[in-house]
Amino acid sequence: MAQPTIKDVAKLAGVSISTVSRVMNDSKPVSPEARKKVLDAINKLDFKPNELARSLVMKKSNLIGVIVEDIGIEYMAQLIRGVEEIGHLYKYDIILSSTYGDDNALENAIDFLSTKQVEGIVVISEDISAEILVKLRDNKIPFLLLDKLHDFKKINTVKIDYEKEEYELVKHLFEQGHENIAYVTLKEHNYLTDVKIAGYQKFINENNLKSMIIEADGKTSDDGYNIGEEVISQAKSENVSAISFYNDQTAVGFISYCLDNNIKIPEDYSVVGFGNFEISRVYRPKLTTVSIPNYDIGAIGIRALIKRIRGEEDILENDWVLDAQLIERDSTKKH
């Protein structure tokens, strides 16, 4: 049996098609009598309007596309949760697409979401090329970049001040009596690695301390383990007592190396990470780290995007900077 159409509803209700449309969209006043006839006809026919067709007419789908690098990454899942929960409060549904770091997949995701008539796009990725940015701008759909520190002009975001937070982390070690503090970053530099190094270097320079920066091959726990021998060698030669790592994973990998080589943490070295990932809470010793408010970043970001979609106040005229939190655990001690 064929699905009923808006024409069938109008015929049964004894009104015009435009009257049915006004009732469905609540766009213009309709008399109570006509409204009742239309609603009765809709219920009798079990009429379900084609949402895509309605969205094309009204230019309103109540859909927001979220492109994520990898939903399996813990903090990205927290960002998505903030986006989704606040989006639902504003009556928006989320369409999720994963790219796994592939630029072609990211381009395809943008094209796919455009065909779904999304009203806005959130991109959650650590690395976005200038070419992708051009594609987003050309698409004419309001968009928001999260988890991407960049120097693109006139594209604001919600974030923490990574330079300030790394500065405060090194300051915490200094206040515990550590004066020889090393920093482990990544060989492959990007905007984020550079601002974290700047935070470390700023405190070191302000306090006339000696800088020691070591580069790991990557940001996994295996990379932290593999850099262990080099870190210990340099730490011994420079009398280092505390080491700050780019993230929690490399810090925990290094601690694992120490455990395998009869080096005690924090007795021999104080170790700190960055991110407050689950691994920092379950590994022993529990890791001193910096907690990033990822849920709040996602929640504020989606609220800003929805306001932009609706033509309301732009709450992201400048970057919205949130405070992170130092979480002191068992991997550090006073020197």
Residue ranges and their predicted role:
Residues S16, N62, E119, H178-N180, ...:
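Short acidic/polar active-site loop segments enriched in Thr and Asp
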Residues S233-A242, Y246-H335:
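Flexible loop/turn connectors
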